[in-house]
Amino acid sequence: MSKNSKAYKEAAEKVDKTRLYSPLEAAKLAKETSSKKQDATVEVAIRLGVDPRKADQMVRGTVNLPHGTGKTARVAVFAVGDKAEQAEAAGADIVGSDDLIEKIQGGFLDFDAAIATPDQMAKVGRIARILGPRGLMPNPKTGTVTPDVAKAVSDIKGGKINFRVDKQANLHFVIGKASFDESKLAENYGAALDEVLRAKPSSSKGRYLKKVVVSTTTGPGIPVDPSITRNFTEE
């Protein structure tokens, strides 16, 4: 839905920019303002009160969304031998080592998440400049550098998402599809916000959640009250 289209403008008029919505209200409104032509993704954008330039204020983490994302993630795994077999059995979409690294160096990036066994990380480091900026670099803090590749694959396929603050102190993550019931979207939102709050750096001073906006990929932004995370039923 183009921002200049009549449909988008009509959808935007439904959003009261002078107020903050509860998570459940925002979920309902996201569904109402989404294009009916496709099952749009519902996203959350958060402005944090941190300085990402400081190492002790880096915010990152993972969360298993209780209702998944509505999309089956494509997972790449860097592993060999038994670990490679375990990854394939768990449903990994592509598994390899040097061959996979060469493929990525050649431009292949048809996956949503990457996992590596610890022994592969020295090799994977060769493509850090490719994977890092895209949020695809395996990292022990997000559980994507692990000897238990089968569990990591299953977690991601089951709706596990990663979040990481960018250089502008923003976080972006998915909480589902517009076809989800609003209560499921609100529960996914609450689970994700819990983890974001848990990841607050001790050195962060002042207001941590400065601004929260929920939107679909085809709809307008909906401002959400940052102080409310878990009102899953109608007020």
From Swiss-Prot:
InterPro entries: Ribosom_uL1_bac-type, Ribosomal_uL1, Ribosomal_uL1-like, Ribosomal_uL1/biogenesis, Ribosomal_uL1_3-a/b-sand, Ribosomal_uL1_CS. The keyword Translocase does not apply. SUPFAM superfamilies: Ribosomal protein L1 (SSF56808). Gene3D superfamilies: 3.30.190.20, 3.40.50.790. The keyword rRNA-binding applies. Signal peptide: none annotated. Keywords: Repressor, Ribonucleoprotein, Ribosomal protein, RNA-binding, rRNA-binding, Translation regulation, tRNA-binding. One of its GO terms (molecular function) is tRNA binding. NCBIfam families: rplA_bact (TIGR01169). Part of the 50S ribosomal subunit. This is Large ribosomal subunit protein uL1. It comes from Mycolicibacterium vanbaalenii (strain DSM 7251 / JCM 13017 / BCRC 16820 / KCTC 9966 / NRRL B-24157 / PYR-1) (Mycobacterium vanbaalenii). The lineage of its organism: Bacteria, Bacillati, Actinomycetota, Actinomycetes, Mycobacteriales. The gene is rplA.
